[in-house]
Regions:
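Carbohydrate-active catalytic/glycan-binding domains of CAZyme proteins
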Residues: 1-578
């Protein structure tokens, strides 16, 4: 039986993967944008089965995150290991910009941020050469196009990792692989044989996303582009390819000398939508005539690959040893043909504690939440608590769909923009979410289940008061805007619409969302065994094609006073996602 790697290796909204190997262990970090805690870190022994071991950015090490459009925050981390220390270099658009955190143990604790005020631009990366010298590279408007105008390019500088400062001025080493290629970014450097290899993303992170390669014999020399660029993309496969938006790669060498790349991509739903956002995929890489060749033989990301033989042998040697995480639960490759868009659905406990990717069973019987849970923005007030085997969310004044604001660095560190919202990523194309809520709204208060995408595109299944009546209703929120929030002149207007409404007087209610692709069936009842349908909603109305594809769907529980701080609390007895 041939063991397999199944894509995506980390399903759901876990984009911009960066990977490193330390001995027999593999570690991977992803972007988290405006979620808190931030920058999830995963561990694997076989590249197939990943377990989250921590968040690098937490309340304990001074993490600030502001809820806004969903597309700000922290993005494009690079994870590296050198001389007994792990490094994550990243950009926080809700704080001072570029920073580094370090840890002796990748499971934490991670240091407080070392702010890199002398590091320009975004998507900074660290590189340690064979002699141990560190270098920093990044993305910025550094390339002179010959007309006196600076264009986006890649820069490189020697770096002092002990004092977190650049040694000398940054040197521009590359602009784009293709002439006037859009958005060259996310650079990583590798020293392989006689060459330094530069891997970047290009084309923007949507349909035209791509991986580009360049090389130089001298670190600060001229980097020649690979004549075969792009070395990986799906943009030539049309807008209905089941795997789309491929790019943003990082490479890792295995103990036997073989290579793999982790990269982001999206699964297409019903040939048009990408509600799950950008996920983490993997593919083999071989070296041919001095260049990296991604996914040899096919040149595209496959749903499955043969597992690395060296890791299969290591895992099989551990079977029966009791080390289940190291041995893994391999797939046998017997996936049915014609299941385009469906492969990669998580099965089993691939996550941490009680929950796997897309599998959550939460009865709130512990004060410690599992890694699958996230807040939207940092919670500054005590608007949530776990007591008496229930989650309690307070009806604070902020709502989930407040008017959007322009995105800037160094935002205000206050309670002004927090929300009482606790959510999990949607990791499966077909998902059922159910929860039990106890809540009697007054005034403008509301609470319930929310399906949240970026840019105020949301569904709320909520208990509220409407024209003096106690009701259950499904609300749709959308936003019209002129440019992305990180562009000058951003302006937007949020609209709301009642999709369905029914009277409901009881304090307790069970809420359910049955998501089957883009068909959202909304149900409710007194118990989970006595549910009836409220309506069927269209998931396409909030899919990333409407709002840009930076983030993915979050589903969770919320409470709000809709403009007023109230003393009422919504109580959630349990939550399930399957």
């Amino acid at each position: 039986m041939q063991k397999k790697l199944t894509n995506p290796i980390i399903p759901g909204f876990y984009p911009d993967p960066s990977i490193c190997r330390v001995g027999e262990d593999y570690y991977l970090a992803c972007s988290s944008f405006e979620l808190c805690p931030g920058v999830p870190v995963f561990h694997s022994r076989d590249l197939a089965h990943w377990e989250q071991i921590c968040y690098a950015m937490t309340l304990e090490n001074g993490f600030h995150m502001e809820r806004n459009s969903g597309v700000g925050g922290v993005m494009a981390p690079t994870l590296r290991y050198h001389d007994g220390l792990f490094y994550i270099i990243n950009t926080n658009f809700s704080d001072r910009g570029n920073y580094i955190v370090t840890a002796e143990n990748p499971a934490g604790p991670w240091s407080e941020p070392h702010w890199l005020d002398d590091v320009p631009g975004i998507d900074a990366s660290l590189f340690f050469d064979d002699d141990g010298q560190a270098y920093i590279l990044g993305t910025g408007d550094v390339w002179d196009n010959g007309t006196g105008v600076k264009e986006r390019g890649i820069w490189l500088a020697k770096y002092d990792v002990e004092h977190f400062r650049m040694l000398g001025e940054p040197v521009t080493i590359f602009n784009s692989a293709l002439r006037v290629g859009a958005s060259p970014e996310s650079p990583h450097l590798y020293h392989v044989g006689d060459y330094y290899y530069l891997i970047i993303a290009e084309g923007g992170t949507e349909h035209y996303h791509a991986v580009m390669a360049a090389r130089s014999r001298e670190l600060f020399g001229f980097y020649e582009g690979n004549p075969a660029n792009p070395v990986m993309t799906h943009r030539h496969m049309g807008f209905q390819s089941p795997i789309i938006n491929v790019g943003h790669a990082d490479l890792v060498e295995l103990p036997d000398g073989s290579w793999y790349a982790v990269l982001l991509a999206s699964r297409l739903i019903e040939g048009k939508c990408k509600n799950l956002g950008r996920e983490t995929f993997i593919c083999p890489v071989v070296w041919e005539r001095g260049w990296p060749l991604f996914s040899p033989k096919t040149g595209k990301i496959e749903w499955e690959y043969d597992a690395p033989l060296c890791l299969v042998r290591d895992a099989e040697s551990l079977e029966g040893s009791g080390d289940a995480a190291a041995a893994g639960l391999w797939t046998d490759g017997n996936r049915e043909e014609g299941a385009a868009g469906m492969p990669g659905e998580p099965g089993g406990d691939a996550g941490s504690g009680k929950s796997g990717f897309g599998l959550v069973r939460e009865e709130f019987d512990s004060e410690t939440l599992d890694f699958c849970w996230s807040f939207w923005g940092r919670p500054y007030r005590d608007f949530y608590k776990i007591a008496d085997s229930a989650l309690h969310l307070k009806c604070i004044r902020q709502s989930l769909a407040e008017e959007l604001r322009p995105m800037t660095f160094d935002m205000e560190k206050s309670e002004a923009y927090e929300t009482a919202f606790l959510a999990c990523r949607q990791c499966s194309i077909h998902t059922t979410v159910t929860c039990k809520m106890k809540f009697l709204p007054a005034g403008q208060e509301s609470a319930g289940l929310a399906v949240v995408q970026a840019m105020n595109h949301q569904y709320h299944l909520e208990r509220a008061k409407s024209q003096g009546r106690q009701v259950l209703r499904l609300m749709l929120y959308t936003a019209d805007y002129n440019v992305p929030p990180y562009f000058p002149g951003f302006a937007s207007t949020t609209c709301e619409q009642v999709i369905a409404e029914t009277p409901w007087e009881a304090e307790e209610i069970v809420l359910r969302l049955e998501i089957r692709g883009e068909r959202f069936r909304v149900c409710f009842g007194e118990t989970r065994d006595e549910l009836r349908e409220l309506c069927v909603a269209d998931g396409e109305l909030i899919n990333p094609e409407k709002v840009g594809c930076m983030t993915g769907t979050m589903i969770g529980m919320y409470a709000t006073g809709n403009g007023e701080d109230c003393e009422n609390w919504a109580e959630f007895g349990w939550f399930e996602m399957e």
